[in-house]
Amino acid sequence: MVYSYTEKKRIRKDFGKRPQVLDIPYLLSIQLDSFTKFIEQDPEGQYGLEAAFRSVFPIQSYNGNSKLEYVSYNLREPEFDVKECQIRGVTYSAPLRVKLRLVVYDKDAPANTVKDIKEQEVYMGEIPLMTDNGTFVINGTERVIVSQLHRSPGVFFDSDKGKTHSSGKVLYNARVIPYRGSWLDFEFDPKDNLFVRIDRRRKLPATIILRALNKTTEEILDLFFDKVVFEVKDQTLMMELLPERLRGETATFDIEANGKVYVEAGRRITARHIRQLTKDDITHIEVPVDYIVGKVASHDYVNEDTGEIIIAANQEFSLEDLANLSQAGYKKIEVLFTNDLDHGAYISDTLRADSTVDRLSALVEIYRMMRPGEPPTKEAAEALFESLFFSEERYDLSTVGRMKFNSSIGRDNDEGAGVLDETDIIEVMRKLIDIRNGIGEVDDIDHLGNRRIRSVGEMAENQFRVGLVRVERAVRERLSLGDLDAIMPQDLINAKPISAAVKEFFGSSQLSQFMDQNNPLSEVTHKRRISALGPGGLTRERAGFEVRDVHATHYGRLCPIETPEGPNIGLINSLSAFAQCNEYGFLETPYRRVVDGQVTDQVDYLSAIEEGTFVIAQANAVLTEEGTFADELIIARQKGESGLHPREHIQYMDVATNQVVSVAASLIPFLEHDDANRALMGANMQRQAVPTLKADKPLVGTGIERNVAVDSGVTAVAKRGGVVQSVDASRIVIKVNEEELVPGEAGIDIYNLTKYTRSNQNTCINQRPTVLPGEPVTRGDVLADGPSTDLGELALGQNMRIAFMPWNGYNFEDSILVSERVVQEDRFTTIHIQELSCVARDTKLGSEEITADIPNVGEAALSKLDESGIVYIGAEVKGGDILVGKVTPKGETQLTPEEKLLRAIFGEKASDVKDSSLRVPNSVSGTIIDVQVFTRDGVEKDKRALEIEQMQLKEAKKDITEEFQILEGGLLARVRTLLVAAGVSEVKLDAMDRKQWLEITLDDEAQQNQLEQLAEQYDELKAEFDKKFETKRRKITQGDDLAPGVLKIVKVYLAVKRRIQPGDKMAGRHGNKGVISKINPVEDMPYDEKGQPVDIVLNPLGVPSRMNIGQILEVHMGLAAKGVGDKINQMLKEQQELHKFRNFLQKVYDLGETRQEVDIAALSDDEVRTLIKNLRGGLPIATPIFDGAPEASIKELLKLVDLPESGQLKLFDGRTGDAFERPVTVGYMYMLKLNHLVDDKMHARSTGSYSLVTQQPLGGKAQFGGQRFGEMEVWALEAYGAAYTLQEMLTVKSDDVNGRTKMYKNIVDGDHRMEPGMPESFNVLLKEIRSLGINIELEDEE
């Protein structure tokens, strides 16, 4: 196996046995691909902005004299880059410019004579852009647009499963759902009539739709019924016989022909009878005359002499009608064929219930239902019906909808119009009637072939189209009104509605969410989340069990494990590791193709529909060397059912064992040994892990840690290979390899690192270089670690030495006992950065001012402020300290204009100001790490703002100069090579100024040309950098675009270092969570025979009932892995030769039957030394899920490092030194510190703010509220008879306003008495009763 440069530094031993057919695809592609589709120019005009423009333009004026056409669009460059946008609190977006063409026709000339054409580029608002990591920066905060799982457009056949009607009869229905437009529903009622609803309004007989499509009764009956023909011969009736139609009927008369009785009267007709009739080729039988009574005429029968209708279509026959018909000379009579089994008379019955007679009356009926109360006219009724399903402006099935529609009603082709036509509607009714007749199945709505993914691009496009449609109306009106000769396209378009629609979507849509930025995993998972909620989706309250449940088609597409606990369970899902979206938006998953029992490496992506009938083997099926199945019978899936299949029948095979689950669940080692509920908690809690001060890779991992870390974008990854030229804390410079150069560039890549910035969750984002100068790197290598990554691997927590044993009740109910050593070594110390901001506004009484001159504040309180009134960087502050001094004018009276004038002339200071400074919140203390000042354009900058500006300019200049020097050096080095090759002596060159080299003239023309090219490049480079600096300078010095009424904003960043302490929540990766109960001195912790104490003691009772055995295996494996590190340390202590290390390492990596081949001999001595150095803390191990290390391998590894195979050690009590009576399971578990810190939750109140109406204290930490003494607590005091305690609880401690002020005063005076009065809530009750019109008065006791 080939390892990249970073991977060689620390090779993870892989216990996986199945070969890796397919690497996990790029994890954020669902976001990036979708958005790229949205903004890229699409010549077909099917997707993105192009599609939106084409669907709205051209816009015709009402009078037809002019139209506005769309030509093309382009997105300009964004003004600020992502980092600048985050600092300034603005949206990262690009201006959209659209080229429009206004065509004016000559109204006096014949039709369509063009009078004038004007083209112009028009600004159409800003389009937020996606960053490289799949997020959007909206108003300075990073947000993610979550993809939505919604019902695919198309037609769905469903039933109510017998729940609607009391009889329990199953009623079937069909629903045509367009991508946009009105829904069309067909449904049966309990009497088997077919009804139609439009947009879920009141129902009408379904035949009204057919009548509105201009069908007569005869045509309607023709469409849905077969006919039976009777011939009238000399007083007898002969019936045309199709034997198949008789099955299941009971003969009411003898069925005979040619003198032979086939079925006696009263007998049921069976398949045997039908076979005999078919065999004897019987085509007609005689039937009694009354057999036709009750049958239904298929068309009108007219007496040709008189012109009167004897019997109308859809009327039932009587004997009288029969007589009239034979009198009128009819020899053949056609009736509808119906029976109770599989040819119901539904449409015929519905026609009888339908009161309409022709097209107009049907249209009027539909109009009345859609627009009740409006008087219908013929034109209005026609226009309404036309616009409902047949107009492209109002109705669109979309490509997906048409594809699903056609496949649902059994057509072969995928294409078709976006609107419906009459055949579509008739086919839907036909299929619904077939289903009612028992032919065909209803659809499964939860099948992933019926639900599709709507991603960012598509949702943004829809919003954009909404904005365009709003603009369209305005444009139409302006075109009809204005003087068209003077008007330009720019005057017609108002960009506001468009940008408003887009802004609203990105800023406040339910699916635009504040990014979860706790750690790299939570970022990745958030971007891969699939929600069924949101606009056009489900609501929590309405969603039943079926929608939330795991469906067979989720296999390899949506994760069955990772979903929130609580009301959203099952509605919010996560994409499986290998899942992708196809062009229609359906989820696909990869499978290896199996050809004639041979498993190939060809991978096909199948959607849930395509997967339908295939037989698919699991990834852990045993294969032979040749790639065929080893066993005769193989566990495989077909149509969602698992079973045993012969190996010849297998058509596909899973690509990987973690194909079923999401990324977060694939990070849990030994997942296969955990109960699903606990695995769910484990997957969810990894997302809440806070990045620790020193990241520590998991000793026991699953091998995909590197994928997550690199794809999340928190690490710096080499874009091209090369050699590291220089490294410091904030930048890495790489000289690119010759073969990867683009001709004519300097060949230097510069990576600027992010230092100590704040994440959305207030954790700290910081990148640290992992490479040294002179090291070779290849493309894709990790150059710098981000938060929670260690040498390019995800590292969410710390490897802790744990023991499973009770310890004095300190681990009762999942509590955790932690050693003091963990605190001393800062293992779980985390840095949290808070942003506090102070805004100076313009008020009615004058403007607020940021200043150090604050009334009634002592010197001590101002000690940390500079002369501008802003805190120094590096100051240590605690609760209540002033960070930014600010005063607000408080005016008793509004100034008269005269006074204002005098003030303006003599510059008198505002009469009266009050202190409104920004202070540190009560429970917070920390260090100031950064201050930023934003000043409105036109307001003079204060001293501090100018200092910050100078500093930023200096930094920018330094950065740009250094970058220029590096690139210049690269270019001049190439010049030197060229000159030396041309024969210029090196001594001379070194004596000259380097820039003069470019002025040398060479004899060889080709070389001279090359030199001139390089000189040209040098000039270009210089010009580019000057321009770059100028742009940067402009950005830094220009005023900021602040909200209206805001003069200045000061943002202060405060870093808090939080050590672990009792009350913090910790967890393992298997759903084993708990709260720290005590930090124990090291000397009291249990220790082993070598004297090594454990770090954490966990309760063994937390394992059996929760069935997460994975944690036990992880602990044993961790012990073995750490054992390898200890062994290496011992060998280093003994100063053994390098070849012994090589042998030991080879032995370790060869252990077990694994797919991994590590050849230690192929590594250079330096590489082996680096590897040894990185393995001293333990050997990192990968046990992929469902393909992990077996028990035997764990025992083998334990044996190799001289540890007991049981994984249990003899422990001694740290307090007494006595041995515990049984060996204890000790090992290493990867523990996480979750973002539920006791510091954020602890809260106490003495006095504080009160609610306005009830006058009771507020609740919650944010409001500095009190503890609620609720109903049940009152009952408890009542039960104890504690009357006085109860009285003070209900009065002075709560809402007796006078009582509590008096009591406060008494306490100050040292007099501890209370006088309870009337609680305010009682007054509220009185007022409420009075508001009902009942007067209630309190009488004083005389």
From Swiss-Prot:
Q: Which residues form a coiled coil?
A: none
The Gene Ontology biological process terms listed for this entry are: DNA-templated transcription
Q: Which EC number(s) does UniProt give? A: 2.7.7.6
Give me the reactions it catalyses: RNA(n) + a ribonucleoside 5'-triphosphate = RNA(n+1) + diphosphate
GO terms for molecular function, please? DNA binding; DNA-directed RNA polymerase activity; ribonucleoside binding
The terms describing its cellular component in GO are:
DNA-directed RNA polymerase complex
Q: Which CDD domains match?
A: RNA_pol_B_RPB2
The protein's matches in SUPFAM superfamilies, at most eight in alphabetical order, are given as:
beta and beta-prime subunits of DNA dependent RNA-polymerase
Q: Which family does it belong to?
A: Belongs to the RNA polymerase beta chain family.
Subunit field text:
The RNAP catalytic core consists of 2 alpha, 1 beta, 1 beta' and 1 omega subunit. When a sigma factor is associated with the core the holoenzyme is formed, which can initiate transcription.
Q: What HAMAP family does UniProt report for this protein, alphabetically?
A: RNApol_bact_RpoB (MF_01321)
Q: What is this protein called?
A: DNA-directed RNA polymerase subunit beta
Tell me the lineage of the source organism: Bacteria, Pseudomonadati, Pseudomonadota, Gammaproteobacteria, Vibrionales
